[in-house]
Amino acid sequence: MSSDNGGIIGVVNDPTSTVASGVWQQEEQYEAKVNDTWPQRALFTTKSLRFDDGSSDYLTKSVSSTSNRRTFTYSTWVKRSNLSGSNYPRLFNPFVDSNNFFDVYFRNTDALNIYSYSGGSENIDLVTTQLFRDVSAWYHIVLAVDTTQGTDSNRVKLYVNGSQVTSFSTSTYPSQNADLQINVSGVTNVIGRNQSGTNNYFDGYMAEIILVDG
């Protein structure tokens, strides 16, 4: 700490890329940031998974027992890389069969699509007007589902970077108390491609992929 830092006498502040100990005046911190010597927070890139559509990368997680199919929250951090790669790249795809599945993916327009198909009928189809084309940006995507809600638009809520998305080019909501094709015993949750494994590979980074039921 510097000798004029609030009257405290000590060694001169000398931050590194990872440590800035001691007592700091605001102007000292500002100057260190300007000089790019102030430690930066850990970025997701160093703690994320890299999905390469050219290498057909993906993850799977099997569901061991059926839990809440009406209320759940899915969240992830996503950073896209190749916008001209796979068609309709998948983020999350629990799949029972061709008549029963759940899907979170980017459309070819780069809109985000939340889709659910149960018993051969579509029960969720939300397509954002917002487009996700910034390959330098991390997007925090949170999907909060509660089909027990009385108001249809409250049954599926989408948040991007902390703000609720309310503008959709398509907006189909599930019926009240609908059981969705998620958290179903024996089903494999696929991350980074569709269940069939033939196409729709995601290209980019993902971090902190979380699914909470109830």
Residue ranges of predicted features:
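Interface-prone segments of viral and bacterial extracellular assemblies
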Residues: M1, V23, Y30-A32, M206-L211
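Short, intrinsically disordered N-terminal pre-domain segments
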Residues: M1-V19, D110
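Extracellular glycan-associated modules
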Residues: D4-G6, W38-G214
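Compositionally biased, intrinsically disordered low-complexity segments
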Residues: V11-P15, G22, Q26, T37, ...
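Serine/threonine-rich, low-complexity intrinsically disordered segments
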Residues: T18-A20, Q130-L131
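Noncatalytic linker/hinge segments flanking ATPase motor cores
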Residues: A20, Q26-Y30, T151
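Extracellular glycan-recognition surfaces and repeat-rich motifs
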Residues: Q25, E31-A42
